[in-house]
Each structure stands twice: as C-alpha cells, then as structure tokens.
Swiss-Prot record:
Protein name: Ribosome maturation factor RimM
Any one cellular-component term (Gene Ontology): cytoplasm
Residue span, PRC barrel domain: 95-168
Places the protein is found: Cytoplasm
Source organism of the structure: Streptococcus equi subsp. zooepidemicus (strain MGCS10565)
Family assignment from sequence similarity: Belongs to the RimM family.
C-alpha cells in the first residue's frame, strides 16, 4: 500500500492525550477531521499502526490532534517524532489545476525551455504556496504559486514552465 505524508508529531500537548502536529498538507481540516483514518510511521519510516482522529483544533502553527482510544499522555508520548500518513486510496480527487505536494516535489522547472532547477520543497507562508527550486551552482529560488509565475504544470512530462518575474531571482 502506498502512503503520503500529511504531518509530523512534534510534541505532546497537556495530559489528555493531545499531540502537536506540524502539517505538510493543504487539506488539514479534511485530513485531521474527527473520524479520519491515518497511519503512524516511526522515525525510521516503518508502519506502526492505523489510528482514528478523535479531535482536532488549531493552536498557533500547530494542529492539535487526539487519537480515538488514547486519552492520556502516557498512551501517546511514544509517538513524538512519528509521521502521520494517508493511504493513497483515501486521498480523494482534486479539481482541475490542483495538485498534491508529492506530485509537485521533484518536478523540473523551466523558463523559456531552459532548465532552472528542481522543486525540492513547498512552503506555506501565507496566501500562496511558495515552491523552493534547487538550482545548480546558485542559491535556491523561491517561486510563488501564482498564475503570472507558474504558467504550466505537466505532471506526465515531469515539468513546470514558469516566468521568473523581475526581482524574484536576486542572482541575475
């Protein structure tokens, strides 16, 4: 079975079995809603068990979650550093022009048919995602995911076409 990362448990929260999660999903409300089923993977990326979300709330930059049947700190403390993943068949369909992070990370970025680099990470600083592009012999390039910059995403061809606006590339 194929799984995709949706968050990392970074700490416990209080004594009632809540955990702080750093999400790596655009769909946190859906992923962490009550009744959602996720898989726990340890720090060596080995499957541990499937869990069901009992509760979810936001606190600062964290998603605070609780697993069904685990209502005390002693039951969940061992999960610090573990990853939460969703099974591929539970991901759901996206609208046209929407993508999962795992589909974007690793794509090659081109400007006017010149290879710029490869997308290595996606940041969520505010209104728009920012794609971090690893380049040869240059610093990483930060590209906002907006229509005037990202012109075309072709998952099949493993390619993204962009127009790097003036001011985005401080090495030119």
């Amino acid at each position: 079975m194929e799984y995709f990362n949706v968050g990392k448990i970074v700490n416990t929260q209080g004594l009632q079995g809540e955990m702080r999660v750093l999400s790596v999903s655009d769909f946190t409300e859906e992923r962490f809603q009550k009744g959602a089923r996720l898989a726990l993977f340890d720090d060596k990326d080995r499957f541990v068990q499937e869990v069901e979300i009992a509760s979810h709330r936001k606190h600062k930059q964290f998603d605070i979650i609780k697993f069904k049947g685990m209502y005390h700190i002693n039951a969940i403390e061992q999960f610090k550093g573990y990853n939460l993943k969703i099974a591929k068949e539970h991901q759901g369909k996206l609208a046209e022009g929407e993508f999962y992070y795992h589909q974007i990370i690793g794509l090659e970025v081109y400007e006017k048919d010149q290879l710029v680099g490869e997308i290595k990470e996606i940041l969520q600083p505010g209104a728009n995602d920012v794609w971090v592009v690893k380049r040869q012999s240059k610093r990483d390039l930060l590209l906002p995911y907006i229509p005037s910059v990202v012109l075309c995403v072709d998952i099949e061809k493993h390619r993204v076409d962009v127009e790097i606006m003036e001011g985005l590339d401080d090495e030119d």
